[in-house]
Amino acid sequence: MHETIRVKIITPSSIAFEKQSKMVTMPGEDGMFGVLPHHVPMIVNLKAGLVQIYIYNIHNYENTYLISGGVTEITSHYINIVTEVAINVTNLSESEISTQRYELQKLLSHQH
């Protein structure tokens, strides 16, 4: 299967990520879920957590972003993830990701 879906992660200050991908998993309010090309159109609220982007195959994710929550618009050909904060944690260790997650939670708790 050579089909892909365009994935864009959008923050108020920039487009944090934009690329064709095989699959994306993200943190919905009811738990993690995955999206493949030709997915049924939907809009989903997202909670803070990890977005994993599978560029080359659906068995290994190549890009990981920590997001602050938000909303995603899904169509059969694209995924737009709109979030206040998106941190590229692709090359970080599990402990570094935990630290980033903690710092993000502190930031979000001070905003509300």
Curated annotation (Swiss-Prot):
InterPro entries found in the cross-reference section: ATP_synth_F1_dsu/esu, ATP_synth_F1_dsu/esu_N, ATPsynth_dsu/esu_N
Major subcellular location class: membrane
Q: Name one GO molecular function term.
A: proton-transporting ATP synthase activity, rotational mechanism
Question: Pfam families of this UniProt entry?
Answer: ATP-synt_DE_N
Question: According to its UniProt record, where is this protein located?
Answer: Cell inner membrane
Q: Among the entry's GO cellular component annotations, what is one?
A: proton-transporting ATP synthase complex
Q: Do you know which SUPFAM superfamilies this protein is assigned to?
A: Epsilon subunit of F1F0-ATP synthase N-terminal domain
* Membrane topology term: Peripheral membrane protein
Q: Which UniProt keywords apply?
A: ATP synthesis, Cell inner membrane, Cell membrane, CF(1), Hydrogen ion transport, Ion transport, Membrane, Transport
- Summarize the protein's role: Produces ATP from ADP in the presence of a proton gradient across the membrane.
Complex and partners? F-type ATPases have 2 components, CF(1) - the catalytic core - and CF(0) - the membrane proton channel. CF(1) has five subunits: alpha(3), beta(3), gamma(1), delta(1), epsilon(1). CF(0) has three main subunits: a, b and c.
Q: Which PANTHER family match?
A: ATP SYNTHASE DELTA/EPSILON CHAIN, ATP SYNTHASE EPSILON CHAIN, CHLOROPLASTIC
Tell me the NCBIfam families matching this sequence.
Answer: ATP_synt_epsi, PRK01474.1
The entry's family comment says: Belongs to the ATPase epsilon chain family.
Q: Give the protein name, as stated in the record.
A: ATP synthase epsilon chain
List the lineage, top down. Answer: Bacteria, Pseudomonadati, Pseudomonadota, Alphaproteobacteria, Rickettsiales
